Curated annotation (Swiss-Prot):
Transmembrane regions listed in the UniProt entry: 34-54
PROSITE patterns xrefs: UPF0057
Pfam families: Pmp3 (PF01679)
Species annotation: Neurospora crassa (strain ATCC 24698 / 74-OR23-1A / CBS 708.71 / DSM 1257 / FGSC 987)
UniProt protein name: Plasma membrane proteolipid 3
Keyword vocabulary terms for this entry: Cell membrane, Membrane, Transmembrane, Transmembrane helix
Length: 57
């Protein structure tokens, strides 16, 4: 799997604001709402989920 420039930008955004990184990758859907919930419950779970979504798709 090769990383593109957009993947790198999404990863940087995901570390700063995890829901925004998920939104850029998947749009407004269940993944975004799960990530918002995880970010509210704890910042680190939100980052992990965002990175998982970005690297998976």
């Amino acid at each position: 799997m090769a990383f593109t420039a957009s993947d790198i930008c999404k990863i940087i955004v995901a570390v700063i604001l995890p829901p925004l990184g998920v939104f850029f990758e998947r749009g407004c859907g269940a993944d975004l709402f799960i990530n918002i919930l995880l970010t509210i419950l704890g910042y680190l779970p939100g980052i992990v989920h965002a990175l998982y979504i970005i690297l998976k798709y």
